[in-house]
Amino acid sequence: MVCTRKTKTLVSTCVILSGMTNIICLLYVGWVTNYIASVYVRGQEPAPDKKLEEDKGDTLKIIERLDHLENVIKQHIQEAPAKPEEAEAEPFTDSSLFAHWGQELSPEGRRVALKQFQYYGYNAYLSDRLPLDRPLPDLRPSGCRNLSFPDSLPEVSIVFIFVNEALSVLLRSIHSAMERTPPHLLKEIILVDDNSSNEELKEKLTEYVDKVNSQKPGFIKVVRHSKQEGLIRSRVSGWRAATAPVVALFDAHVEFNVGWAEPVLTRIKENRKRIISPSFDNIKYDNFEIEEYPLAAQGFDWELWCRYLNPPKAWWKLENSTAPIRSPALIGCFIVDRQYFQEIGLLDEGMEVYGGENVELGIRVWQCGGSVEVLPCSRIAHIERAHKPYTEDLTAHVRRNALRVAEVWMDEFKSHVYMAWNIPQEDSGIDIGDITARKALRKQLQCKTFRWYLVSVYPEMRMYSDIIAYGVLQNSLKTDLCLDQGPDTENVPIMYICHGMTPQNVYYTSSQQIHVGILSPTVDDDDNRCLVDVNSRPRLIECSYAKAKRMKLHWQFSQGGPIQNRKSKRCLELQENSDLEFGFQLVLQKCSGQHWSITNVLRSLAS
C-alpha cells in the first residue's frame, strides 16, 4: 500500500554533492508532506472531534515514482572523491531512521538497527522491543462510540499477506486482530507466506501458531507458497483458504483499533455487494508512533497509482463524520463478502507482483453493480515503509498492470493511461498477457461503460480527449536533449538529457496548447502547466490562469516543423549557452528554421 497524503513535484536534475560521492537525482517522486498538520499520538485519551470543514480543493496526492535517472546521465558526471573524514564517518549518520529516534543508542546498537531498517524498510529493532499488545489511541470520530450495531453479524476471516516481514510486526498484527475483534465475529486468521527466506518466519512463527491453535484448534492457518507469486495472487490464495462469510484482506504490518469490525460487517450485511475499506492511520516507520490521518476517499491518477482524495461534496453536506464515504477505488486492504468476491471475479491474477489491482477492483465493482466505501468508524494503523525491500522498482509492474486495466475496463479512455505513461498506443512493446477471460467477465457481468464511471462515480477525474500528440519534444539542433519542466519553483522550461520520465512529458492539444509535466489527475489538483510566451521568454504557467489572463499560450506546431506562438509569431528555439550544463537554453526569437518532433501523434498536427 503506497498511497500518501500529499506530494510535491520535484525536478529532474542530478546534483553531485561537493566533496562526496553521493549523486542526488531529484525526480518526479513523491516527496511527502502532510496534507493536514498531524500530531504524533502518544496518549490513549481520544482527541475531541474537529469540526468538519470541507477541503476547498487540495486533493491528497500519490507518492511513488521509483524511476532511476542515473543511467541516462552518468556520462555527464564523474564521481567525486570522498574526503577522508567522510570516508571514516559512521554509515548510519545520514539515515532517516535516526532523525527522530535512536540518539541514545550505542554505535553498535545503531549499526544493528540500521541493518534491520535497510532490510525491512521500517524500524524492526524498535518493533522487537515493543509489546505485542501495546495500546492504541482511539482515533474514531466521537460519534462512532454512540453507534449501535445488530446482534447478529457475519463472521470474518482475516487474511495477512507477507514476504520477509519482521516477525514482531507480523505477530503484533495478529495479536491486535485477536484482541480488538469480538471473538464471536472472528472465525479465523490466515497467514499467506509468499515464499519468505527469513528463518524467523518458519520455526518461530510455527511455534507461535501451534501455541495459539493448542487453545483454539485450527484458528490460525498458514499458507506457504513454494515460489513468490506477488501480492495480488497471494491475496487470492488467502481468499481461497478462508471459510467465513466475510474476508478481510490486509498487509501484515497493521494494527487494528477498537471497534473496527462491527461497522464493516454491518454495512456488508446490509448489502453484500459493498466492498469496504477502513480508514487508515500511519505507524511511523522510524519510531512506531501513531499519526492520525484525515478522513479520505481513495482514487487514482491516470497512471493508475493510488491516491487519497477529499471525501465527496455529498459527504461534507451530511455534516456527519461517522457516515460512510463513497470511494472511487481501493488502496489495497479491504473487506468483502466471500461469495460476492468470487462472483465479481476476485483479483486479476494475470497482473504481476503489485500495483493496479486495487484500482482495477474498484472500477470493476462500480461498473458491474457494486459499490466501494471507506468507513470513518473503522480505523486501522498501517506502517508506511521508508522503502520497499522486496523489489527495487515497482514501476514496470504497475505500468504493465495499468495497461491491462485500460484495455479491459476503460474503453476510449484507455488512451489516457498510455499518454500518462508516455507509451505509444499502438505497438507499445509491453506484453500485458492474455486478457480474453477478463473481457469475457465484463461481458458476463453486463458492466457499465467507463464513461459512466467517470460521470457517476469519479467526476473529479480530469478528461483529456483534446490531446492530439504526446511524448518527449526534441529539437533538430540537439536531438539528445528534450524539453523539460525544469525546477518546479522557477516555472522556466529547460533542455535536459532525454530520459522520458514525467518532467519531460509534453502534451499538444487541439486548442494548440502545450502542457509540460504531469497530467493533473483531478479538478481539485493544481492545474496543468502550459508553455506561455511571457515578455519574449518561455515560461510554464498554470493553464487556467494563463487562459483567464489571455496570455500567449497557443502554439502552431506540426511534426518536424517549428513551434511558433500564434500571437507573438516568435518561435521556440535553442540557443547555445556555454554557462549551462548541456550547452543550450530555450529562447523565443524570430524563426530561424529549427524543427521540433514529438514522440506520438494521434491526429494530424495541422498548423
From Swiss-Prot:
Its EC number is 2.4.1.41. It is an enzyme of class 2 (transferase). Its main location: Golgi. The chain crosses the membrane at residues 13-35. Its cofactor is Mn(2+). InterPro entries: GalNAc-T, Glyco_trans_2-like, Nucleotide-diphossugar_trans, Ricin_B-like_lectins, Ricin_B_lectin. It catalyses: L-seryl-[protein] + UDP-N-acetyl-alpha-D-galactosamine = a 3-O-[N-acetyl-alpha-D-galactosaminyl]-L-seryl-[protein] + UDP + H(+); L-threonyl-[protein] + UDP-N-acetyl-alpha-D-galactosamine = a 3-O-[N-acetyl-alpha-D-galactosaminyl]-L-threonyl-[protein] + UDP + H(+). Residues 469-599 form the Ricin B-type lectin domain. Residues 36-607 are lumenal. This is Polypeptide N-acetylgalactosaminyltransferase 18. It comes from Homo sapiens (Human).
